[in-house]
Amino acid sequence: MAEAVFCSTIGRAYERELEHLLFFNARQRTVRAGVVEALERYGAPSIVHENDALRVIVSGCPGTQCLFALAASGDPPQLLGSVIYMRNPVDTLTILHLAVSDDTVTEDDQNPLIVVRLVDQVRKLARSIRGVRWVHVLYSQSGQFQIPIRPRGGHSFRSGPKE
């Protein structure tokens, strides 16, 4: 896996790649139920132009933020993935949508590394926000789960529906 850099906005040149990543991603079928639930609960993501940059917002959730993973090399660097998240409730950063580029997925239809790196970046951000104790992932191939920001007792995550 190529090295990645993470940023909250990307240039307008990435608009087609981002549209494909968010709206036409072939792997969405593997987490379809979770995607549908997230859309019904929080609203649809949309790409917005801000000066010369692109951001992603979610219609029903003011305050959503996005983080993009770009290849550290290349001209231009390849868009590897994105994660859309928000603070909800006050002690949790909730990951609403997580997408990985078709080009970064391995032959066995998985690329856990870029997914793990995106989630880890959200976890690092959460550590810097006072009062945030959890990162909640709404959907994955194994269902919902929560990751503690400061693990206690050797447990690294809690699976199942959020309580």
For the regions a protein language model found, what residue spans apply to each?
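Conserved N-terminal entry element of GNAT/NAT acetyltransferase domains
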Residues: 1-30
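Conserved catalytic-core motifs of GNAT/GCN5-like acyltransferases
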Residues: 152-163
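Short, intrinsically disordered/low-complexity patches at protein termini
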Residues: 42, 118-119, 158
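Acyl-donor binding region in acyl/amide transferases
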Residues: 88-152
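Hydrophobic, Leu/Ile/Phe/Ala-enriched alpha-helical segments that form helix-helix packing faces
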Residues: 22-26, 71, 122-130
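A conserved beta-strand-loop-helix scaffold within acyl/acetyltransferase catalytic domains
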Residues: 37-92
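Short glycine-rich, low-complexity/disordered patches
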Residues: 30-51, 130-141
